[in-house]
Design a protein with these regions (language model features):
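FAD-site-proximal beta/loop scaffold in flavoenzymes
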Residues: 94-119, 203, 212-215, 219-280
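Beta1-alpha1 glycine-rich phosphate/pyrophosphate-binding loop at the start
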Residues: 1-50, 129-170
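C-terminal auxiliary extensions adjacent to catalytic cores
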Residues: 318-358
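Glycine-rich, N-terminal phosphate-binding loop of Rossmann-like dinucleotide-binding domains
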Residues: 71, 83-84, 208, 220-221, ...
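A Rossmann-like FAD-binding core segment of flavoenzymes
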Residues: 9, 43, 48-64, 74, ...
Length: 358
């Protein structure tokens, strides 16, 4: 939120109930159970002149460009909604009781403990709903776990399932063949078109059949935060529609960025939910607001360009990069694998944390 215009603008960041920023919990360092490297206290933003307000956001009034934080109403000249996607494991009966949630930071330590205690059998990694953030993460997890079990000489059969027709549809069939080929090379079974509807002790229930497991790691369904849905920003849909170039909502002076938005690509599929897009969108919105507050107009526009790394084991990574908003279709390529891409991946993560938090 930017409560005051022009030169005197003061930046406020509403942190919600979280005090700690977690980077990519779904990318799975669960085998170590170490989250510290990817964590930063949000209070560190105050060193950059950003005021962090701690508390649950209980209401959003987009017509007034206002938000309510635990009873305190905050009004602004510009409002940026960046509340992400909430995890909804409760939508799958039995998930919370039987699966380890790959995307919940607090669930990583118990998942790590379960992995260290595992002595062999069937491991399943499942996507329980789409869309979900960081689409490559389940496949990265499977490949890294293969290396983890091999180092420990643990005999594990690993399966990965998704309700989608291929691993990463945005890559097209050729790119998915490469990813799925890597899984096969590592002895990992890939199951497409598998929509899970429930989890029971020792079995995942699908729309057609069941499959057994001894250890289950899952990506739960995602949903728009309730406070956003109740505000009218979703316009009756599942996510917030925005101008794909300016990130403006239908309410003047109200923007939405990141996983909370729905931006269609030219092929009709939604833009993947990925941090690289949230960052680029945020930069566009910041430029446009700053220009407006100074009495001008910015031509900054979201280009839909981005890349992400997929760690694939053996000290290597692949690179997914593209122009996702191109017409008549997204232009997305898959490069690698190579050790250089893994080095780039680690450097990128470190640099981003340093840039944002110091």
């Amino acid at each position: 939120m930017l409560p005051q215009p022009a030169q005197s603008a003061r930046h406020e960041s509403i942190a919600g109930t979280h005090r700690i920023y977690h980077r990519n919990p779904g990318s799975l360092n669960a085998k170590d159970g170490l989250l510290g490297h990817g964590q930063r206290p949000l209070a560190a933003l105050e060193r950059k002149g950003i005021r962090v307000i701690q508390g649950a956001i209980t209401a959003i009034d987009p017509q007034a460009r206002a938000a309510e934080v635990e009873g305190r109403r905050l009004e602004a000249d510009a409002l940026i909604v960046a509340l992400g996607a909430d995890l909804a494991p409760e939508r799958v009966p039995g998930f919370q009781a039987h699966a380890h949630n790959l995307y919940e930071a607090q669930a990583i330590p118990p998942a790590a403990e379960a992995l260290r205690a595992f002595r062999g059998g069937q491991v399943m990694i499942g996507v329980f709903g789409v869309p979900y953030k960081c689409p490559p993460a389940p496949y990265e997890a499977a490949l890294l776990l293969r290396g983890f079990f091999s180092e420990r000489r643990v005999q594990a059969d690993i399966e990965v399932f998704t309700p989608q027709p291929m691993s990463l549809p945005v890559l097209g069939q050729a790119g998915c063949d490469v990813v799925e080929g890597r899984l096969a090379d590592y002895g990992i079974t890939f199951l497409s078109n598998h929509q899970a509807v429930a989890v029971e002790a020792g079995e995942v229930v699908f729309t057609a059949g069941r499959r057994p497991y001894d250890l289950l790691l899952g990506v739960p369904p995602h949903r728009c935060p309730q406070v956003v849905a109740q505000s009218g920003l979703t316009d009756g849909g599942e996510w917030v529609p925005v101008n794909p170039r300016t990130l403006e909502t239908k309410f003047p002076g109200v923007y939405a960025i990141g996983d909370v938005v729905a931006i269609p690509m030219a092929d009709g599929k939604p833009l993947p939910k990925a941090g690289v897009f949230a960052e680029a969108e945020g930069e566009v919105v910041a430029e446009r607001i700053a220009a407006a507050f100074a009495g001008g107009e910015s031509q900054a526009a979201f280009a839909g360009e981005g890349s992400c790394y997929l760690e694939v084991g053996n000290g290597e990574a692949m690179l997914v990069q593209g122009r996702f908003l191109d017409t008549p279709a997204p232009q997305v390529t898959l490069l690698g694998p190579s050790r250089a891409y893994l080095e780039e991946k680690r450097a990128f993560e470190t640099e981003r944390l340093q840039k944002w938090f110091g």
